Design a protein with these regions (language model features):
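Core alpha/beta nucleotide-donor-binding catalytic domains of modification enzymes
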Residues: 1-203
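Conserved small/polar residues in nucleotide/adenosyl-binding loops
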Residues: 206-208
Length: 208
């Protein structure tokens, strides 16, 4: 019996229009979402499967970051995947706006890889919960109704495109899939911190 999540992912991937064997760059944090995305891509039928390469950034924000780096390095070696690694050194961390600065560093790194390698597609593991949070954050910040647009499943990025093939999947669905298939991943310790608007909204929504 085919796995429902894998069947649905195949349908979403087909919509992305990426040719089979096309090289794609997957942004991986070692969390549940990105490790599940990696697994789903590798389990695509051969006639649909892209050539996967991985981009990982150690942001030096968590005590477990060295373990995460070792984990993704060994994972890529075991699965024969090209891995691009970078470190955001602590000395460059700002005192305020660290989450946004980390994101900017990360995406500059992804863009540089694409420019240097000619890879056209960047994949991230944003899911439907991220989509809902983005719209809610804009509403909380006073956005007009017309401006309350969430995350797009595809957009131009650098010299290529940014694709989000998990955007129609819930966090719960991805976690259940990971458990069913014994996919190893790291919990993001920073999600337990209640000092960023997105995490505050997440905690509040989980309380109700």
């Amino acid at each position: 019996m085919k796995d429902k999540t894998e069947v649905e992912f195949q349908a979403e991937w087909k919509k992305m229009g990426v040719p089979a064997n096309e090289t794609v760059l997957v942004a991986v944090s070692t969390g549940c979402d990105s490790m599940t995305l990696l697994s789903l891509l590798q389990r695509l039928p051969e006639k649909m499967r892209p050539t996967v390469q991985v981009a990982y950034v150690d942001h030096q924000l968590r005590e477990q970051s060295k373990k995460e780096t070792d984990f993704i390095t060994k994972y890529c070696q075991k699965n024969g995947l090209v891995l691009f690694k970078n470190v955001w050194e602590k000395e460059f961390h700002p005192k305020k706006g660290i989450e946004e600065s980390a994101r900017e560093f990360r995406y500059r790194f992804f863009e540089k890889i694409m420019e240097e390698t000619g890879i056209e597609y960047l994949l991230t593991a944003h899911h439907s919960n991220d989509q809902a949070e983005t719209i809610l954050m804009k509403a909380v910040r006073g956005g007009d109704l017309e401006q309350l647009v969430g995350i797009k499943s595809a957009r131009t990025f650098g010299t290529g495109k940014l694709l989000r093939p998990l955007l129609h999947f819930s966090k719960e669905t991805l976690k259940e899939y990971a458990e069913r298939n014994q996919i190893k991943y790291f919990e993001d310790e920073t999600n337990a911190l209640d000092d960023v608007l997105r995490n505050r909204l997440r905690h509040r929504s989980e309380e109700h």
